[in-house]
Amino acid sequence: YRGIQDAKAAIRFFRKTYEMGNPYGVDTSRIILCGQGTGGWIATCLNSVDKLSEIQLPKFLDAVTAIPLIDTTLFGDWFGYGGNPMLNIENHKGYSSDHDMILNMGGAIGDLSWLEAGDKPMVAAHCNTDRVAVFGTGNLSTLGVQIVSDISGSYDVMHKADSLGNNDMIPMLFDDYTIAAQNNFASLISAGAVDADSNAITNSVSNLFPLITGNPAEGAPWDYFDSLTTVAIAMMQGLPAAQGAAAYSGSLNTNPDVSIAKATAYQDTVLSFFCPRIVNGLMLPGNTVGITNANKGISVNVYPNPATDFVSFNSSTNINTITIFDNSGKLIKNINPNRFTYTIDVSDFAKGIYHAEISNGITTKTEKFIIE
């Protein structure tokens, strides 16, 4: 919670410095938060927490007294405003805390219900073997003690974000890193893989790169650490050298093949997956969104959506072709209707998200539909 407050205060700080000559070169119209580990939690939760009721769900109440664990009258609200001045200092008040996009590396959300339609677009990378921020939905525990029940990692978060339409501005992509992510999903699904809470991985999810490292409990392959540094940090904190050595040894349990080469390779992979989605999601120069939607003359209604048995396409112009892909980019069906309205039997389609490219022979429009 304090991390959410601090992140919002940081956004306000950069907006404030923009008026002071912009020493940090910030484009205040395009602010993205990227976090890994705890930072991923902060970014994902910051994107969704906007109601008092969300931080006062039953699981966030004291089990004995039913008093909220987060008392905004003491600690301030999620913007960092209000509360007891002895416990919360308001920073850079008067500037916007708004952001434009979230990038999450191995983080999770306190409760999936926080995520709602209209939240900012999100992209994620996550190991299905992560034991702290579970890939799907499970309990947050440390040292065997459950802290919070039913937290949700990137697999469930991104599925819901996509289903709500929050990522609609990110088109289907077919670059090498997107294909690699799809192949990883295919490998996990075919192997009957589960996450650290034994949730089955049954479908691929757009805008999520599932990282497969081969280590059974790994959650942060982009990390690098060495014994000399961890010992030095421990001693700087007034702790015995042995405690730093123990921290190093403990980290090897989940990342036994740690190296700079490995860490930077995973960092490069994650950024190469993120960056095209940043460009398209924020409509930066070089985006590909306009390629399929450049001509606004073609208008298509897709209904019902979600669907179970059939999907109809009603176009403002003659439909030459309809090409349907599943959410992994696999070609499912290609049709040549040569009419303005066409209905497709989808009763044999697997449940999930699909993308239809509708062409009138001159322009193409892509529409998303869901099979339940």
Regions found by a protein language model. Give the residues of each.
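Gly/Ser-rich "nucleophile elbow"/oxyanion-hole loop immediately N-terminal to the catalytic nucleophile
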Residues: Y1-Q5, A9-G37, L52-L57
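Loop/turn elements at helix/coil->beta-strand transitions in domains of secreted/extracellular proteins
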Residues: D27-I31, G40, S97-I102, G118-M122, ...
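Glycine-rich nucleophile elbow surrounding the catalytic serine of serine-hydrolase chemistry
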Residues: G35-C45
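Mobile cap/lid helix-loop segments that gate and shape the active-site cleft of serine hydrolases
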Residues: S48-W114, K120, V134-S152
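Active-site-adjacent alpha-helix of alpha/beta-hydrolase-fold enzymes
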Residues: K120-D226
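Catalytic active-site module of serine/aspartate enzymes centered on a nucleophile-bearing elbow/loop
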Residues: V231-N287
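C-terminal outer-membrane/trafficking sorting elements
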Residues: A294-E372
